[in-house]
A protein has these predicted regions:
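A short alpha-helix capping/helix-coil boundary motif
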Residues: 30, 75-76
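Generic structural signal for well-ordered alpha-helical scaffold segments
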Residues: 43, 47-55, 75
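Alpha-helix capping/helix-boundary segments
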Residues: 70-71
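Phosphate-handling substructures
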Residues: 1-47, 111
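Short basic (Lys/Arg) and small-residue
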Residues: 67
Length: 118
């Protein structure tokens, strides 16, 4: 995810720096940070890759290693959840989440934010 001018800032710092934009960003997944990428843009990119992986590796187990927002996007997709999950779901660094996607389009989330192995 490209957070643009907010990259490296804490959540509070971004809110203080761009108060109105930050509020808009929190309420609308189509709003990007300054010079950054919206959550909708991330979802389009991630779900496109998801479809390519499903097609290429049908019936196989695939490990995807990524950053927080793409993982949250895949979990959101698997749960058929709304955008609020992007702001309410915490994922630790190096955590393990497991979502299974089936040929009929169904999905199941088996594990989220597991860190016991660390």
């Amino acid at each position: 995810t490209d957070f643009g001018e907010w990259e490296g800032l804490t959540f509070s710092e971004a809110a203080e720096r761009d108060t109105e934009l930050h509020l808009s960003w929190l309420g609308d997944t189509s709003v990007p940070p300054p010079d950054g990428e919206s959550f909708d843009a991330v979802a389009a990119r991630v779900l496109g890759a998801h479809q390519r992986i499903i097609a290429e590796y049908a019936g196989q187990t695939v490990l995807v290693v990524s950053h927080v927002t793409p993982i949250k996007t895949l979990l959101r997709h698997a749960l058929d959840a709304g955008p609020a999950i992007l702001y309410r779901l915490h994922l630790d660094l190096a955590s393990l989440s497991i979502a299974e996607f089936y040929p009929d389009g169904a999905a199941s989330v088996r594990l989220v934010n597991q860190t016991a192995y660390l």
